């Protein structure tokens, strides 16, 4: 199956390689990170999928659509004030962050993940010279934090399709909220939302009946 976006024909099977490339993904030398607070090094999104509830979805969608109208810009602070930053980065931020979505679609997706999971991850793809090529919001089934012998942090993304990818934590933009008990992740919505969603479903069922 293929689709055309921004004048480029892509095959769904090639999207993973389009984002992460074909490089060596062997990270067997890494070990699980240990946190001082004793929390696990794995984050799994709330299995209740609050976005499946129409009320939660409508609220999130309203916020996401409004924030999707923002115009992101890259600027640099100098001794004489703020000046325009990289032209290529501004094109990525303001026009097409990646081949699969527009700037507004990118923002809407990031905001939706932020409110759904209290953690949104954006993979920063760079070329061999370190120049930013694209920004990809990542859908994931779980995220595991790992560390190497030099104490560099890595994140292993396990995706719904069974594939996984491990990258340096510095290679992602991690936006979080309800950043309280865990040292790295925003708290998941399982306990906070389950009771409210159950009550909301019960009220809807009572109205229908």
Give residue spans per PLM region:
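Structured, contiguous alpha/beta core segments that scaffold functional sites
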Residues: 2-209
